[in-house]
């Protein structure tokens, strides 16, 4: 796999593979998180990242909504089982969505390296530190 930047768009997000071990998922303003949309993002992530384990920064804008049924699905179960996700930072720009994401990740424990924050700078710094530690410890 080469290290050039690649990107793709789904109905709800722009996904950018910036390195073979790092992807950013920027959800589109006004989108709705539902099971079909999350499956679409998951498929796009797999196509961009292949089988290489990676870290992910997800950015959720202020005006995103969600369907309750999407909360009843562990959307990252397969990736976690396969060891694909090393660390996740989720940046939410709305208090309600931050609470929803924290609730979701407590209901479906993902992995030990996960952070939900309202600060993009904090999310990026945290994820960078996690990636540096992973590169040292494996």
List the predicted regions and their residue ranges.
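Amphipathic, Lys/Arg-enriched alpha-helical "gate/interface" segment within cytosolic domains
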Residues: 1-138
């Amino acid at each position: 796999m080469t290290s050039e930047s690649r990107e793709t768009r789904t109905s709800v997000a722009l996904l950018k593979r910036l390195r073979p071990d790092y992807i950013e998922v920027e959800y589109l303003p006004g989108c709705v998180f539902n099971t079909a949309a999350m499956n679409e993002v998951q498929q796009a992530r797999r196509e961009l990242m292949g089988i290489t384990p990676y870290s992910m920064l997800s950015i959720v804008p202020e005006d995103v909504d969600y369907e309750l049924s999407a909360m009843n699905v562990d959307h990252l179960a397969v990736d976690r089982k396969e060891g694909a996700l090393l660390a996740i930072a989720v940046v939410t720009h709305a208090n309600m969505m931050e609470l929803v994401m924290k609730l979701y990740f407590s209901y479906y424990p993902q992995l030990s390296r996960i952070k939900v924050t309202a600060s993009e700078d904090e999310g990026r710094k945290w994820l960078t530190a996690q990636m540096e530690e992973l590169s040292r410890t494996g």
